[in-house]
Amino acid sequence: MNIIQQLEAEQAAKIAAKRTLPEFSPGDTVRVNVRVVEGNRTRVQAYEGVCIARSGGGINESFTVRKISYGEGVERVFPVYSPLVESVDVVRRGKVRRAKLYYLRDRRGKSARIVENTGTRARKLNDAERQAVVEEKARIEAEKVAAAQALAAEKAAAEAAEAKAAEEAKAAEAAAE
């Protein structure tokens, strides 16, 4: 492994540690939550459509999502390791036999539909994804509880220190009189 591949692997691991993306492939309907900056405000916008391609590898990997918006086909390319991509949710798994679904650009209506994959692999992926989401929520909740307990302990220590200081001040006043 040369130095560039090593650096890319380190960066990909660092980004993957912050957020986990589910396993998805072309044909799957995905909801991509993207951070949008408007002036000095930031908000998260959901972009839902069919993943029609995954390309590249390593840190340069990207995927293309196509949706029909007000009768017009809109495609958007998202880098997998972009900091602007908050999360990706798989809405449904599609059953396709191609890696690139560019033929959907020429199709309209029912002919552009993709059959839902209900096989065992898709079921396992969905179950694993749900389990990962539950574990992530439990971990976040545990962190919140730990932070709340630490804050309560900190407040109690501060109040005890204040009470002790007030007690010492009263003792000093009594000694001065």
From Swiss-Prot:
A Pfam family reported for this protein in Swiss-Prot or TrEMBL: Ribosomal_L19
InterPro entries per the UniProt record, alphabetical: Ribosomal_bL19, Ribosomal_bL19_CS, Ribosomal_bL19_sf, Translation_prot_SH3-like_sf
One term of GO molecular function: structural constituent of ribosome
GO BP: any one term: translation
Organism domain of life: Bacteria
Signal peptide residues on this chain, from the entry's feature table: none
GO cellular component, one term: cytosolic large ribosomal subunit
Alphabetical UniProt keywords: Ribonucleoprotein, Ribosomal protein
Functional description taken from the UniProt entry: This protein is located at the 30S-50S ribosomal subunit interface and may play a role in the structure and function of the aminoacyl-tRNA binding site.
NCBIfam families tied to this protein: rplS_bact
Protein family per UniProt: Belongs to the bacterial ribosomal protein bL19 family.
Name of the protein in its database record: Large ribosomal subunit protein bL19
Protein's gene: rplS
